[in-house]
Amino acid sequence: KHEYLRF
């Protein structure tokens, strides 16, 4: 689960 592109 990646949450680094949370705009």
From Swiss-Prot:
Q: Which organism is it from?
A: Panagrellus redivivus
Q: What is this protein called?
A: FMRFamide-like neuropeptide AF2
Q: Where in the cell is it found?
A: Secreted
An example GO BP is: neuropeptide signaling pathway
Please verify whether the record's keywords include ATP-binding: no
Summary of the function given for this chain in its UniProt record: Has effects on muscle tension.
What keywords were assigned to this record? Amidation, Neuropeptide, Secreted
Tell me the protein family, please: Belongs to the FARP (FMRFamide related peptide) family.
